[in-house]
């Protein structure tokens, strides 16, 4: 099993969610996040004063899936989240040792 974590622009969330559903994925976890990469933040004007906003709003999507579904999920996220501009985000893939459904005690892919 693998866990995909994708950091994307907030306005792309609905497109990514739909793309993952079309790819056959059932459940995702979404968390609001703030961060920056190469784009470093931006300057804003407030009451006549300029200030630098270091952290930009992002959304983190997490999904656990079988190894055979990883490439399709990555491609679905990449295509749906891409704007072609700096700050589109990142996709991280990591191994998952075990999953347990709390309600039933099911484990492994049965718990996903």
UniProtKB/Swiss-Prot annotation:
One GO location term (cellular component): cytosol
Residues modified to O-UMP-tyrosine: 51
Keywords: Nitrogen fixation, Nucleotide-binding, Phosphoprotein, Transcription, Transcription regulation
Superkingdom of the organism of origin: Bacteria
SUPFAM superfamilies in the cross-refs: GlnB-like
One Pfam family this sequence matches: P-II
Gene Ontology biological process terms from the UniProt entry: nitrogen fixation; regulation of nitrogen utilization
Sample GO molecular function, one term: ATP binding
Quaternary organization: Homotrimer.
Similarity remark: Belongs to the P(II) protein family.
UniProt cross-references to PANTHER family, sorted A to Z: NITROGEN REGULATORY PROTEIN P-II, NITROGEN REGULATORY PROTEIN P-II HOMOLOG
Cited function: In nitrogen-limiting conditions, when the ratio of Gln to 2-ketoglutarate decreases, P-II is uridylylated to P-II-UMP. P-II-UMP allows the deadenylation of glutamine synthetase (GS), thus activating the enzyme. Conversely, in nitrogen excess P-II is deuridylated and promotes the adenylation of GS. P-II indirectly controls the transcription of the GS gene (glnA). P-II prevents NR-II-catalyzed conversion of NR-I to NR-I-phosphate, the transcriptional activator of glnA. When P-II is uridylylated to P-II-UMP, these events are reversed.
Protein name: Nitrogen regulatory protein P-II
Organism name: Mesorhizobium japonicum (strain LMG 29417 / CECT 9101 / MAFF 303099) (Mesorhizobium loti (strain MAFF 303099))
Gene: glnB
